[in-house]
UniProtKB/Swiss-Prot annotation:
It is found in: Cytoplasm. GO terms for biological process: cap-dependent translational initiation; formation of cytoplasmic translation initiation complex; response to bacterium; translational initiation. Residues 517-527 have a biased composition (Basic and acidic residues). Keywords: Cytoplasm, Initiation factor, Protein biosynthesis, RNA-binding. This is Eukaryotic translation initiation factor 3 subunit D. InterPro entries: eIF3d (IPR007783). It comes from Dictyostelium discoideum. Residues 100-136, 503-527 are annotated as: Disordered. Component of the eukaryotic translation initiation factor 3 (eIF-3) complex. One of its GO terms (molecular function) is translation initiation factor activity.
Length: 527
């Protein structure tokens, strides 16, 4: 009998094997250490802090780490144990005691911990999220088509470097409309003397930039046209987290920034909160539901705190006649222009919310009126009803931290409109499960300059960002473009879109022909 030996490869130049084995060809090589943890076993005694911490070893980038691919919410365990008859009465007594103890301070109570449950303060309302490590991809504000050509990509992390040497001086072109006076009765409202928030049936007029009759008549005063809300979106872009988009029209040496047709301005809620700030399983606390609620609360609060029996303050000119002002609230518009240098002159429509009486011998002062609404204080901040009267500064700091983008837009819009004061209302739900009824718990006036400083808003940097975007768009050919804030990357993409993109189909061709004739001033600017 003979012994057959396998082929042995010899390495004459060093130690170790040579060549490759075919059975190992398709196995990828991944470096690892024997001290690394291969995934993580179940540890029911660990707490939330230990679960979130990875002291060493594998992490999300290690190929050996176990990853949850499917949603296990539908997975349940079936209890097949048999209940013994002799423990029947004793079991009922124990279950009754356990229920009563959990009702006092169980795992989801979030209050004073009961004897039979976990400590409420630590594992209260957030305990249902301790095992929720799913990556949440934010939704895009619009579907990006493959046929759109990418022209530019703005890195938001570099926006801090753009600035202007001096703040541009605003020049008022004209003022239109009327605004009502602030009712000082609401200064006496506090958490113990709350007032129900009333609902208004009127809406805010939505006038696209290119359809604004005043901008049409005064278009020679600038070459970049927008509204204060659109300018605020661009100026606060580096703080934004959620996706947004703005349409850009390049006509000759002029730029028009406006909202996409069919869309309206909505406020965000807890946009800058890094924790679990959206609950997809709760229909009233989703991102879209909270946004609609905050937008309606702001409109209702704005109209309620204005005096209805006092003659409103009228500006120099009346609003142009048009259907867009029917069933709308009283608004005041101030059209202003800013010269940023390098042939960039901005002409914008700014909005004024209200007016307060000045000191004796002084003219009235224009103000902005906004509101923050509380929907779940156990998860997102300090409870308004308990701490508003004693810790109002702490509540404001928490709200600015969680809503830095929204506060930046508000203060920028107020600065552009020339409003030195902002009236902020503190509104809460009448019931935590009711997003339709709210109460006013307090009001406070804040200097706009202080809000800018507290939120880290530098107007020189804001104007520098706008100038950089405008100069980039000025280099483009005539056409329609879209500025899109990527939902999951810290960039803004500039796409070239067809001329008929986003156009709404209208049945009445007569109105379309009149619209084309009235835009002759745009064609003139092409020359």
């Amino acid at each position: 009998m003979s012994l057959e030996l396998n082929t042995i490869k010899v390495n004459p130049t060093g130690w170790g094997p040579v060549g490759k084995l075919e059975k190992f060809t398709d196995i990828p090589y991944a470096p690892f250490s024997k001290g690394d943890k291969i995934g993580k076993c179940s540890d029911w005694n660990s707490n939330v802090r230990n679960y979130q911490r990875q002291n060493y070893g594998s992490n999300a980038f290690n190929p050996f780490t176990f990853k949850l691919e499917d949603d296990e919410d539908s997975f349940t365990l079936v209890d097949y144990t048999r209940v013994q008859n002799k423990l029947k009465n004793k079991g009922k007594t124990y279950q009754k005691q356990f229920y009563q103890q959990n009702k006092r301070g169980g795992s989801n109570a979030g209050g004073r911990g009961g004897r039979g449950g976990m400590r409420g303060g630590r594992f209260g309302s957030n305990n249902k999220y301790w095992n929720d490590r799913r990556q949440r991809n934010r939704e895009s504000s619009i579907e990006i088509l493959s046929s759109w050509e990418s022209k530019e990509e703005f890195d938001l992390s570099t926006f801090k470097q753009y600035t202007v040497e001096q703040l541009p001086e605003p020049e008022t072109i004209g003022t239109y409309g009327q605004v009502k006076y602030y009712n000082k009765v609401y200064d006496r409202i506090n958490a113990k003397n709350e007032k129900k928030l009333q609902k208004t049936e009127n809406s805010v007029p939505l006038i696209p930039t290119s359809d604004d009759k005043v901008i049409r008549s005064e278009y020679m005063n600038g070459n970049v046209y927008a509204t204060d809300s659109i300018l605020a979106v661009l100026m606060s872009a580096q703080k934004s987290v959620y996706s947004w988009d703005i349409v850009v029209q390049k006509v000759g040496a002029r730029l028009f920034f406006e909202l996409r047709p069919g869309t309206s301005e909505h406020l965000t809620v807890n946009e800058n909160l890094t924790a679990h700030h959206q609950d997809d399983k709760d229909p009233i606390n989703t991102t879209s539901s909270l946004s609609q609620e905050a937008t309606q609360v702001n409109l209702n609060y704005w109209q309620q705190v204005l005096s209805q029996n006092v003659e409103p303050f009228k500006f120099d000119n009346e609003l142009p006649e048009g259907d867009e002002f029917e069933n709308c609230v009283d608004v005041g518009y101030a059209y202003k222009k800013w010269d940023l240098g390098d042939d960039i002159v901005v002409l914008a429509r700014t909005e004024i919310d209200g007016v307060v009486e000045g000191l004796p011998g002084q003219p009235p002062k224009f103000i902005s009126i906004k509101a923050i609404n509380e929907h779940d204080s156990n998860r997102f901040g300090i409870e308004f009803r308990k701490k508003l009267d004693s810790q109002r500064a702490a509540i404001l700091a928490t709200e600015i931290k969680n809503n830095s983008t929204k506060f930046a837009k508000w203060s920028i819009q107020s600065t552009l409109a020339g409003c030195e004061m902002l009236n902020l209302g503190f509104v809460s739900r009448d019931s935590i499960r009711d997003n339709n009824n709210h109460v006013i718990l307090g009001t406070q006036f804040y200097p706009v300059a202080d809000l800018n400083k507290q939120n880290g808003v530098d107007m020189k940097n804001c104007w520098g960002i706008l100038k950089h975007i405008a100069q980039t768009c000025m280099k483009l050919a005539n056409g329609k473009y879209l500025l899109h804030r990527d939902p999951n990357r810290n960039v803004i993409n500039l796409y070239s879109v067809p001329e008929n993109a986003f156009d709404q189909i209208e049945e009445e061709t007569q109105e379309e022909e009149e619209e084309e004739q009235s835009k002759g001033w745009v064609e003139e600017s092409r020359e």
